[in-house]
């Protein structure tokens, strides 16, 4: 069996099926009493790590999440999918709401060094903020090569071949390990955790640490000025002829 070790980042986000509501004070979105789940792109990253282990190319898969106590539920999901153990970097809820890609990348970089992993896998972006920055920043802090938007990953000895979709075709990268890879939707289809694996996950270890244990300051240099609901779409108007359409467009100043 290979001795490679993989760190997979998993983020707890508001479930994609939930209708987002803005807080009355417009400082963010309502999270209390709202269903949360693992970020879909993170699920893909976990699945890829587990598949590498099933092929006996990886020795250990470690799932990590940064946030409030409820993040342990997200880690348990990763453990049920096949990750070996979890690390919860506990952050108070109020502070967790202000976490950005820069702070999370600092945490991931420190953990990658501490755990001596060979590969950091994470989703290309999270569906709550769509930043698409954490993987790139993590690679920057570690000074590791990176393969973003991966649609196929192949381990070749001490190198990783990454295919990524770009405008007009495919780009193939060959990265020397250790490396950072971010997962695209086309990389794989995540499995559903079976009941036996869900039960086994309850017995797997989750280590709880603080950002300070890693020497990381989570103070953000960004502040949210205001969060607004998207403007309501105005009702459409049915027109019978091309002439009516042109007249209507002139009326509203579009032509």
Swiss-Prot record:
GO molecular function term, any single one: electron transfer activity
Highest taxon of source: Eukaryota
UniProt KW keywords: Acetylation, Disease variant, Electron transport, Glutaricaciduria, Methylation, Mitochondrion, Phosphoprotein, Transport
Subcellular location: Mitochondrion matrix
Coiled coil: none
GO cellular component: electron transfer flavoprotein complex; mitochondrial matrix; mitochondrion
Residue ranges of the TM segments: none
Residues the record lists as binding AMP: 9, 39-42, 66, 123-134
Free-text function comment from the UniProt entry: Heterodimeric electron transfer flavoprotein that accepts electrons from several mitochondrial dehydrogenases, including acyl-CoA dehydrogenases, glutaryl-CoA and sarcosine dehydrogenase. It transfers the electrons to the main mitochondrial respiratory chain via ETF-ubiquinone oxidoreductase. Required for normal mitochondrial fatty acid oxidation and normal amino acid metabolism. ETFB binds an AMP molecule that probably has a purely structural role.
Identification of the protein by name: Electron transfer flavoprotein subunit beta
Organism lineage: Eukaryota, Metazoa, Chordata, Craniata, Vertebrata
